[in-house]
Amino acid sequence: MALSGSTPAPSWEEDECLDYYGMLSLHRMFEVVGGQLTECELELLAFLLDEAPGAPGGLARARSGLELLLELERRGQCDESNLRLLSQLLRVLARHDLLPHLARKRRRPVSPERYSYGNPSSSSKRTEDSCRRRRQASSSSDSPQSQWDTGSPPTKRQRRSRGRPSSGARQRRRAGLAASQQHQQHQELGRPSSEGKVTCDIRLRVRAEYCEHGPALEQGVASRRPQALARQLDVFGQATAVLRSRDLGSVVCDIKFSELSYLDAFWGDYLSGALLQALRGVFLTEALREAVGREAVRLLVSVDEADYEAGRRRLLLMEEEGGRRGTEAS
């Protein structure tokens, strides 16, 4: 007999459940990853997978990355509980930027809209004044004993005579402490204000690579071993060596931002492609073009979205604190 007051639990569709937890379905992840694979990378993946022992072949007919990944799913080589093969293939292609998508966690969209800041000079002035006040307070609150201990290195300290020091020695010590304290305050005030600014680090990755690897692999990869497994391992090793020899290098650098307007301008240029266009003249030099010959070369630029979000929150908090201090001071 069913209870009259009980209600059945609501049944959720798979898409609603994934949206609630901020996850991507397997096929949606295939669309995201496969849509960012180039034709050259598709040819390389099809070549490696078709050479596997017992592989039925036919991956070379895949017209897109989505079709190739769906074919792997139909063969049972890739599913929701086993993405190991896909992870290994992306590492072989040196596409480490696509590995975070395998977690199937939906990334939050970041708006390129900029924050209204007011006068940048006034905000920097407030930051300098607040940092200067903090340094003065910290220097004045230090104990004389700690300043005396750190005022001169241990090797230069003179041995004190046993017994109580004389009044003249105590007066000279007080005068030395006062002079060292004043000198330290003048040094702190004379330092540049950039040391006290709140900054955030944004990691920029720049990589140059060939647009096509297919012709080089066809010329440099071949195996005559009779056994299928040995031939597959031989081909895989040769392909890895060829790709490593064609690595044009990459640059990873951390850029410091102390102004929110500059950070948002940098992010807006990254989203619009202006940053990529500006870096092409820096990295794709004439010497590099002469080294690669007639082959086409492209430049890949990546900025971590999590770094931008964390840095924006940090600088925005600094702007709000500076405005609050300015209001209280007035």
From Swiss-Prot:
<dbReference type="Pfam" id="PF01335">
    <property type="entry name" value="DED"/>
</dbReference>
<comment type="function">
    <text>May play a critical role in death receptor-induced apoptosis and may target CASP8 and CASP10 to the nucleus. May regulate degradation of intermediate filaments during apoptosis. May play a role in the general transcription machinery in the nucleus and might be an important regulator of the activity of GTF3C3.</text>
</comment>
<dbReference type="GO" id="GO:0005634">
    <property type="term" value="C:nucleus"/>
</dbReference>
<keyword id="KW-0539">Nucleus</keyword>
<keyword id="KW-0053">Apoptosis</keyword>
<comment type="subunit">
    <text>Interacts with CASP8, CASP10 and GTF3C3. Homodimerizes and heterodimerizes with DEDD.</text>
</comment>
<dbReference type="InterPro" id="IPR038856">
    <property type="entry name" value="DEDD/DEDD2"/>
</dbReference>
<dbReference type="InterPro" id="IPR001875">
    <property type="entry name" value="DED_dom"/>
</dbReference>
<feature type="domain" description="DED">
    <location>
        <begin position="25"/>
        <end position="104"/>
    </location>
</feature>
<feature type="region of interest" description="Disordered">
    <location>
        <begin position="104"/>
        <end position="195"/>
    </location>
</feature>
<keyword id="KW-0238">DNA-binding</keyword>
<dbReference type="GO" id="GO:0005654">
    <property type="term" value="C:nucleoplasm"/>
</dbReference>
<dbReference type="GO" id="GO:0003677">
    <property type="term" value="F:DNA binding"/>
</dbReference>
<keyword id="KW-0805">Transcription regulation</keyword>
<dbReference type="GO" id="GO:0030262">
    <property type="term" value="P:apoptotic nuclear changes"/>
</dbReference>
<dbReference type="GO" id="GO:0005730">
    <property type="term" value="C:nucleolus"/>
</dbReference>
<dbReference type="Pfam" id="PF20694">
    <property type="entry name" value="TRADD-like_N"/>
</dbReference>
<feature type="short sequence motif" description="Bipartite nuclear localization signal">
    <location>
        <begin position="156"/>
        <end position="174"/>
    </location>
</feature>
<dbReference type="GO" id="GO:0008625">
    <property type="term" value="P:extrinsic apoptotic signaling pathway via death domain receptors"/>
</dbReference>
<keyword id="KW-0804">Transcription</keyword>
<dbReference type="GO" id="GO:2001238">
    <property type="term" value="P:positive regulation of extrinsic apoptotic signaling pathway"/>
</dbReference>
<protein>
    <recommendedName>
        <fullName>DNA-binding death effector domain-containing protein 2</fullName>
    </recommendedName>
</protein>
<feature type="short sequence motif" description="Nuclear localization signal">
    <location>
        <begin position="104"/>
        <end position="109"/>
    </location>
</feature>
<dbReference type="InterPro" id="IPR049341">
    <property type="entry name" value="TRADD-like_N"/>
</dbReference>
<feature type="compositionally biased region" description="Low complexity">
    <location>
        <begin position="137"/>
        <end position="147"/>
    </location>
</feature>
<dbReference type="InterPro" id="IPR011029">
    <property type="entry name" value="DEATH-like_dom_sf"/>
</dbReference>
